[in-house]
């Protein structure tokens, strides 16, 4: 590609509405342009990257024996009503009617469509297992699209769906998809981790996320220092303290605390160790529990894990925190004065709270706290459960090492769905015994557009993007200095350009009449990994300058060795 025949729409200034670095650099590098909230046009440079990501995904899915299909973005509402997700999905599901007043949706996912297809096409266990995938546009009407293509409304996704007659068959395909995903992100040159994850609204029995590590990530990822254990913080078990609870050494006493409505204020004003305080959080209970609220207790320096709390049998899902009005109606005090002593609602204590002694908590009277609280002496030990987020230094759940926490960006997710959709939609086949059998399903997604943004978040510096070779828009940039004034500079540039193309290398020749500084800045901004600078002075000694975008090194290469050198660099 020649810049004179290409749309290189780079920007010097960062647009004011771009919050994260990937959004800023995708705009500045001329990869995308905003059309409306959460909607983006992909320009040539961005599309080249997107297509390379897409091709790697497609190749590895084919290698894993998945079969490519293409399903409509527009889906009839009756399929969503049949699966039960019409009511469950909420406002992110864009619903509309056609001219015949028939209801439809813009698909955010395709479980219903693929299940409908399979129940009409597959009739016998002999045809299974099968795994179908597509790379297709999705639409989710996000309440607040942000971060560019990281959280947009329209996006490109690879989704795959497998169908089985046994859990063993599903497990085999699940493991094959796990390996395929690992190969995909490795080929892209990304630093990623597969982690145990919650199944969320998709449902199912097992789930792994594939997280690209980046300081700007939205997810907290937990790792063990002593094993390969890794999990999303939502799912990481907080192990119970190994030490037994210490004996009581303080008397129970009530203290006036009119200006201490938070744990931080209590600690500061009364010089209490934060590890000797307890937070009491009231959430709505399930109707069938016979109670309106449930109290959840976590240590003052810990955070409630809402995913874990939501799975408690007496807690309403989704988790809803009680309002101050609801709290006062039942307890008679505000949220800043709550505690477990004489609390007239069901109580669930985190494992770490159950191991505490001589601790402080609200007295359920405005402006008062109890200090010196001890289990069994001052109140019975309530139900105990793991309901907190782990913190760095906690023991690993597998008993090997301690935990570290890093930030990650979710780019892939695989699920063992089981029979959630096939049961609801009556997707069956004739089994080996001649009876109808409900299909067992798996689903496997990769956010293709999100991968592009995540790669930038992980690979950039103050000058722009630093693409891994496999997904760079161009692998090599040829930068001839004043080529329009020097025949030999122009001749070598053309020769290298044509030779590299003949070797299948994506190369861009900057043949603009621009200052060298502009040419260098643009190629660094769009992230070309390898650059060749051709100048008259260096040609006197039959040399050119090579620049590596990632390590920043420069070296002189003999003109006759340039091609072999570059091929070696790109393959390395």
UniProtKB/Swiss-Prot annotation:
Keywords: Aminoacyl-tRNA synthetase, ATP-binding, Cytoplasm, Ligase, Nucleotide-binding, Protein biosynthesis. It is an enzyme of class 6 (ligase). Its main location: cytoplasm. One of its GO terms (molecular function) is aminoacyl-tRNA deacylase activity. PROSITE patterns: AA_TRNA_LIGASE_II. The keyword ATP-binding applies. GO terms for cellular component: cytosol. GO terms for biological process: prolyl-tRNA aminoacylation. It comes from the Bacteria. Belongs to the class-II aminoacyl-tRNA synthetase family. ProS type 1 subfamily. Homodimer. NCBIfam families: PRK09194.1 (NF006625), proS_fam_II (TIGR00409). Catalyzes the attachment of proline to tRNA(Pro) in a two-step reaction: proline is first activated by ATP to form Pro-AMP and then transferred to the acceptor end of tRNA(Pro). As ProRS can inadvertently accommodate and process non-cognate amino acids such as alanine and cysteine, to avoid such errors it has two additional distinct editing activities against alanine. One activity is designated as 'pretransfer' editing and involves the tRNA(Pro)-independent hydrolysis of activated Ala-AMP. Consists of three domains: the N-terminal catalytic domain, the editing domain and the C-terminal anticodon-binding domain. This is Proline--tRNA ligase. It comes from Serratia proteamaculans (strain 568). The lineage of its organism: Bacteria, Pseudomonadati, Pseudomonadota, Gammaproteobacteria, Enterobacterales. The gene is proS.
